[in-house]
């Protein structure tokens, strides 16, 4: 058979689908009980989609196709997300001729150079990648209703008016507030940064450091060294301070409110703190070595402690000033021990080594399992030799900090006897109230980079608009909605629950980027994670909006909140529809149809997305639905999928390690790509794309096409007399139908592919081996029937090939709309399956014996089946599943009692092996019927139950495990 032209077949059927509009559902006379509405997070158009995206979008398409074939009226729409600063950031970097950005877009995304330079205008980026993404989705065979397509931002005014309505509703309910809050901030562009505004570091948490002001006397002036700590309770155990002698520090006037103080902090800290409600005026700049050997006063205990040198102090972390608590901090203990051995360093800074030698550790916390100094003990336990043992030190630190926080009891007045977890909060509060403590926010890692290419800082913003996800009543509604929802996989539910708990105010608007202006404060633009939470409702009316727009009959400015209120929130009302006709210029009939569509499709049945959107989009999706819509319209389910890697490596466009979705289709064909990514892992697991495996799968699909094409020539005559092997094939086909159906109902795409493709392929191979030489009506009936069912089972995965084969089979219409197969009741036959498995098992046993025993030129196999009394033993054990109960029952039989000792051994072994699943078959009959086949396959003579006991094997025979002797 010539090589299959996947591309030609795909283009043929994509054209026919679009022309016939088979994926544009009509709701007229369609029962709501049989509707199925599924959506997936619309893609962000800052570049080409890669094969990781292919997984995210193929899963819901497979499910949509499956449900459509089950007879459901399916809506699977698509739109494009262009909100936010990323696209603007790309345009800016291209304008500035940033080499990395130009390389990505020219060499990785393969944008022609003449088009690339037009990307200085962000609108051109949007147009280019929107067209490319739609082409990719069509080429992938996605069964999308394109009549509902739209894109976000004010560039598409109807959707922008919908977002305005959403925000008015949130504001009316008190869920949008103006206030002060810490946000990630691009200091160059001057805008808050949401998750989607970051090039790197979206998962990096923000830490809250307590700055404790240690006093340094410089003549008459008091200067503060604010030591940054995550453990303020340990201030009582400070023995010294650490500064990096090589780092640059500044003396600065720090003004917060009306208070002005002089601080010594790292140069980097001065910059960061200037964004956190402080005015910073640098007075002097110097190296840390200037302060080494000086003493500062602990503001809590009054103790004078020395400043010691430590190159491990990172000036770019918090203030660059670190307090040392060696009794409870492994790093501090080891650093002190190292310094005691480095007298040359101490003498360099005119420090008397005896001062360091005589530092006394201060025990603060009683911790079960440890003595006075837990950090010292943990360091010794792990065998830490010096500061170079960083991994062990990190481990020791985590162990001690966690144990002390959760189980430690504080020993120092006035907090003695209280748990450390409580004391930590009390001391932080006390420090703040006394003016000797302040808060500084810092990223846990440094790699937080905006889409503009700038390193982010944390800024305290005033007069910023927030969505108040911390509202207790709103949280309760979100919890209630989550309880009612189906979450796939169920293991993700706990993550959603945790996120609902910790979500707080989130900045919802910024000053730059594409988007919808905040309706009551248009200087602000709604950000990308805030305009993408309820657009699934907009899909339900978007085809009408698009049609009106194309006909020039829509004035977006007339799409007022009153219009959206009626469509989405109110009861049907003819009078209201007439009023809205007057106000909007849209006919009352179309307004009625819009409302009908929304009421028909909502609630959303399934929302699909990758797991990285759980902490933001998917949880915001729940919150915003419960805020705006009545309970009957709350979403019903969320399905979360895993990520993709490429040849074992994380995909990264900056490193060029990325495979564009469209390139994968060009190289392999859409059906190959679809089946491959569905077969690699269940939807919730990560997958790894490997080119060699894709090539192998392509050959298997070509074999599938070849087989069905061959079977299409057969006639499937009814009422033919079937042999047992024919019945076996139909029974196995039933199993594949059920297995595929059950798996797809739970989004278990890998299991579904195993059943629909690999299991049937393997069963068919066996059937063709077992029926070799036959060309009768029964075999033709089985193969023609199998072809009809197999093509339909595979249609959700490989729709183009299956349409082509469906046409060959003479199927009516499109296979995409054909009836999903149901198991045929009369085909079920567990006995025949057990008999066929028995034949396979015996053949495998014979081959194994020959191989293990290294028998050359084997000529005969003597097979001894179990005596009838052994069947009775096995059946009783399967029923009782207990040694005493089974023996008690068996010993009631006089004949069996004579074999008591032998039976006891058998029962003991069966229970140990948990051999409880048995189905009695006539082993000798099955073997005699399969004798010719076994002899042909194995090339040896088969002798069944001869009178002669060859090799004394006969007594070893057990039910379904015959004794075998080879000669």
UniProtKB/Swiss-Prot annotation:
Reactions catalysed, as given in the entry: tRNA(Leu) + L-leucine + ATP = L-leucyl-tRNA(Leu) + AMP + diphosphate
Record has Phosphoprotein as a keyword: no
Gene that this polypeptide is encoded by: leuS
Protein name listed in UniProt: Leucine--tRNA ligase
Native organism: Pyrococcus furiosus (strain ATCC 43587 / DSM 3638 / JCM 8422 / Vc1)
Organism superkingdom: Archaea
EC number per UniProt: 6.1.1.4
Phylogenetic classification of the source organism: Archaea, Methanobacteriati, Methanobacteriota, Thermococci, Thermococcales
GO biological process, one term: leucyl-tRNA aminoacylation
Positions with a binding annotation for ATP: 653
